Amino acid sequence: MQFFTDSNMQFPLVELSLNQGETVFIQRGSMVYHTPNVTLSTKLNASGSGLGRFVKAVGRSMVSGESSFITQVISQSNNGYIALAPDSPGQVIPLYLGEKQYRLNDGAFLALDGTAYYTMELESVGKALFGGQGGFFVMTTQGQGTLLANAYGSIKKIELNNQEVTIDNAHVVAWSQTLDYNIHLENGFWQSIGTGEGVVNTFRGTGEIYVQSLNLQTFAGLLNRYLPKRS
């Protein structure tokens, strides 16, 4: 899978170029346009088979908020093209999977190729109890290939070398699996209410963290001020 973005667009689409037989999985609803030699089909977003697979996909969707389905894209010949739009305006980056593997927060997945795949990792209740981002699951990558991750706003890469950093959880996009992490409230419940900082991620070790410049929860709260109130 080769991918391109148009630098002239403020919020660019991502165009994928596919060879014959090449398969890509994309976020459901992200397709904007494609060439006639590209076909799309819906797959259950879970491993296994039969009814058990369906129940697993639906159950995971109910708990994590992730869709029960994922879209499979196959090019029937060379020079197949498909354009994708993330569900939030912002930067899209590639994560190359193989020697490096990552975890992703909710809403960061856009596309995946090769033999790469992801699973949803169940967090402890203590980690996720107050989490508005990440839910009870985080995406955990495996295999070889390229994963496209999208953000709300711009993405900054932070590299740790046997160090520690605490980041607002709503700004976290992805991080290396080599890092230890702990999702918790900043300075306890009442201090978090007072400072407005809320849920944070503390990372320790050596690896990469990708953070987004904007906070979707904060923007939603801003919009809510201007929405008509129900009587």
Q: Whereabouts are the PLM-identified features?
A:
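Phosphate/adenylate-binding glycine loop and adjacent helical scaffold
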Residues: 1-231
